[in-house]
């Protein structure tokens, strides 16, 4: 399916959207020994045999849509085992267990449309890998559907995302007031906190953080160790200088965030992009997927504009990696962001205040966790220079200044 995408010059192209399937299989067709072993393990916990599969995702996890002989359609998500790396295996297992627990907790404690988990299997005698079997939710991924929605439906999708389904409910759920990734509480049916699981095991935290200041110091430390800043002495020296300047600015900014409502810890989906949201033709949000990366963070970091509307920081066309594309044009993104800000301002003033107050800090975090190559932090430095010129407009969501 071709969808409109914009390049850094603002030119529109029609590119392949998120695949509806990477590979289809039906009974009678050839299977690898590894896939045959895995499907046999799945069939041990399904009510009937598997007649066909579709590979929905194949990168960090294997996600299959399976059709059974009795007509049921389910989703199976396999956690790939690590290849002889105990540290990576612990990371993979930890995010699998955390995702399972959080999805079950959200189904019991919220109205957020997460898939219902039918079965959980761990690697062992009966299974070659950890996997879960879930219900299949209706709808299409927003990445493929957004351009097909009417202007009214796009605004309705923002309203539905905030008010009825995800964002504002996450903002108000009762969660522990420490910074990290969730684990089951013991005893009880609540949540506890473990060190934050990163999108790569090398980016995970080694402890739980009590304050926003501690967490920001951790992120700066990770960036200084990141391969993205370059390997040479010159690149590292330039990067360290830029990061020190930015950290000094952040420390000053943190002193202005005095309201307890801005520092209250909030549950957030760390990967809430347009391929992890399902919508119908009217803009109703029908599913929120892929909770393996989530965290509890201060409100100023946990809130934000929808990721697919971003032309900021690492998505600013002047400084973005060459691999970045945009699924919404700049002018439309400005209008939809304005609508989003208006919606949350009416529905939850504290959310809106965190949205405004945290705009600069969230941009900094996006740069610190970005793993695209940036030797010497030259892209980051260019953004810092441009942001200084914007002045007070950094914190005004209704006055978004487009890039020149």
UniProtKB/Swiss-Prot annotation:
InterPro entries: AGP_Transferase, Aminoglycoside_PTrfase, Kinase-like_dom_sf. SUPFAM superfamilies: Protein kinase-like (PK-like). Part of the gene cluster that mediates the biosynthesis of clavilactone A, a meroterpenoid that features a unique benzo-fused ten-membered carbocyclic ring unit with an alpha,beta-epoxy-gamma-lactone moiety, forming an intriguing 10/5/3 tricyclic nested skeleton. ClaR, ClaS and ClaT are sufficient to produce clavilactone A and the function of claY, if any, has still to be identified. The biosynthesis begins with the prenyltransferase claS that transfers geranyl pyrophosphate (GPP) to hydroquinone to produces geranylhydroquinon. This is Clavilactone A biosynthesis cluster protein Y.
């Amino acid at each position: 399916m071709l969808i409109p995408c914009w390049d850094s010059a603002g030119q529109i192209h029609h590119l392949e959207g998120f695949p509806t399937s990477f590979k289809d299989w039906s009974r009678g067709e050839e299977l690898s020994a590894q896939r045959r072993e895995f499907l046999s393990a799945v069939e041990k916990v399904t009510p009937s045999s598997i007649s066909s599969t579709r590979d929905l995702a194949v990168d960090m996890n294997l996600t299959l849509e399976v059709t059974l002989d009795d007509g049921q359609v389910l989703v199976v998500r396999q956690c790939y085992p690590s290849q002889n790396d105990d540290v990576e295996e612990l990371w993979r297992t930890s995010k699998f267990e955390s995702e399972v627990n959080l999805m079950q907790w959200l189904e019991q404690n919220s109205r957020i449309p997460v898939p219902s988990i039918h079965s959980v299997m761990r690697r062992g005698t009966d299974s070659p890998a950890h996997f879960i079997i879930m219900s299949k939710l209706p709808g299409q991924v927003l990445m493929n559907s957004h351009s097909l929605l009417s202007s009214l439906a796009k605004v309705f999708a923002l309203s539905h995302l905030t008010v009825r389904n995800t964002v504002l409910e996450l903002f108000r759920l009762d969660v522990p007031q420490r910074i990290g990734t969730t684990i089951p509480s013991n005893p009880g049916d609540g949540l506890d906190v473990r060190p934050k699981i990163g999108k790569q095991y090398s980016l995970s935290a080694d402890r739980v953080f009590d304050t926003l200041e501690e967490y920001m110091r951790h992120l700066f430390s990770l960036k200084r160790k990141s391969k993205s800043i370059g390997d040479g002495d010159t690149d590292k020296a330039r990067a360290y200088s830029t990061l020190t300047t930015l950290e000094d600015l952040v420390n000053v900014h943190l002193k202005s965030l005095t309201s307890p409502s801005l520092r209250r810890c909030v549950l957030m989906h760390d990967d809430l992009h347009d391929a992890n949201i399902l919508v119908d033709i009217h803009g109703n949000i029908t599913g929120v997927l892929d909770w393996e990366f989530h965290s509890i963070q201060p409100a100023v970091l946990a809130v934000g504009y929808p990721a697919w509307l971003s032309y900021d920081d690492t998505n600013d066309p002047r400084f973005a990696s060459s691999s970045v594309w945009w699924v919404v044009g700049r002018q439309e993104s400005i209008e939809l962001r304005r609508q989003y800000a208006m919606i949350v301002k009416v529905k939850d003033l504290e959310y809106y205040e965190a949205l405004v107050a945290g705009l600069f800090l969230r941009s900094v975090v996006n740069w610190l966790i970005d793993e695209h190559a940036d030797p010497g932090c030259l892209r980051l430095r260019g953004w810092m220079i441009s942001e200084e010129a914007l002045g007070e407009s950094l914190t005004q969501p209704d006055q978004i200044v487009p890039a020149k």
